[in-house]
Design a protein with these regions (language model features):
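Non-transmembrane, aqueous-exposed alpha-helical and coiled segments at domain scale
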Residues: 1-207
Length: 208
C-alpha cells in the first residue's frame, strides 16, 4: 500500500476533474475521510471532493457489477455521484467468460501460474487488442447480441477444452442488458468534456 488513494483524495480538492485512464478492478484505493472508510476499484477516488467530476476513460476495463456496487455504496454514504461521474462508451467490458478463462489459464499453467486476481483483467485486455472485445457502444444496437454470440461460441470451445462448463448465451445477454440499463445514465462521450475543460483552463488529475 503506497498511499496513492490518500494522495489523490488530498489533491482532488484542488482540481476540477479526476480521471481513471487504464487498468481495471484488479487493484484499488482505500480512502478514509469524514464519510467513512471506502475501498474503491473503478470509481476515481477523487470523487469524494464534492466539486470534482470523476471520469472513467476508454482505457479502463469495467466489471459492471463492481461499478454498480461502488456507485450504490457512494450514493448511500451521501457522496452523491449522480451528475459527477461519467464513463466512456468506448471502455471495454469484463464478461463472465473472461473471469472463467482467467482461472482456467492459471490452473493450466500449474507451477508456472502467474498469480492473477482471476477477475478477468488479462483476458479482457487480450480481447481488446485482438478486436474481440465488447464495449458500451455495442449496447446501443443489436451489435451487442451479435458480438456476444460470436465471442461465446469461441470462448466456450476454449472453456470446455480446458475442463470448464460452457456458458449460456441468454443468461449473459439478459444480465448484461440489465447492467447497461442501470449504467446508461453514467455513460457519456468524454472527448467534449475534456476538450471544453482544457479550453476553459480547468485542472485535471489522472489517477491510476
Amino acid at each position: 500500500d503506497e498511499g496513492k488513494g490518500k494522495a489523490v483524495d488530498f489533491l482532488a480538492e484542488r482540481v476540477d476533474y479526476v480521471a481513471r485512464f487504464n487498468g481495471g478492478n484488479n487493484a484499488g484505493h482505500t480512502v478514509i475521510n469524514n464519510f467513512g472508510t471506502f475501498k474503491i476499484h473503478l470509481v476515481p477516488s477523487g470523487i469524494f471532493a464534492q466539486n470534482t467530476t470523476g471520469l472513467i476513460g476508454g482505457g479502463v476495463v469495467i466489471d459492471p457489477q463492481v461499478l454498480l456496487e461502488e456507485i450504490e455504496m457512494l450514493n448511500k454514504a451521501g457522496i452523491g455521484v449522480d451528475g459527477r461521474l461519467w464513463v466512456s462508451p468506448r471502455s471495454h467490458i469484463i464478461m463472465p467468460y473472461h473471469k472463467i478463462l482467467d482461472g482456467l489459464y492459471e490452473e493450466a499453467k500449474g507451477a508456472g501460474a502467474t498469480g492473477t486476481t482471476r477477475r478477468g483483467i488479462g483476458p479482457v485486455f487480450a480481447d481488446k487488442v485482438s478486436y474481440n472485445g465488447i464495449r458500451w457502444t455495442d449496447f446501443t444496437s443489436d451489435m451487442f447480441e451479435q458480438r456476444l454470440q460470436v465471442q461465446l461460441t469461441l470462448k466456450n470451445k476454449i472453456i470446455v477444452a480446458l475442463g470448464g462448463e460452457a456458458l449460456k448465451y441468454e443468461e449473459i445477454r439478459d444480465t448484461y442488458r440489465g447492467y447497461y440499463s442501470r449504467l446508461k445514465p453514467y455513460i457519456r462521450e468524454l472527448f467534449s468534456i475534456v476538450q471544453d475543460g482544457l479550453k476553459e483552463g480547468r485542472n485535471f488529475l489522472l489517477e491510476q
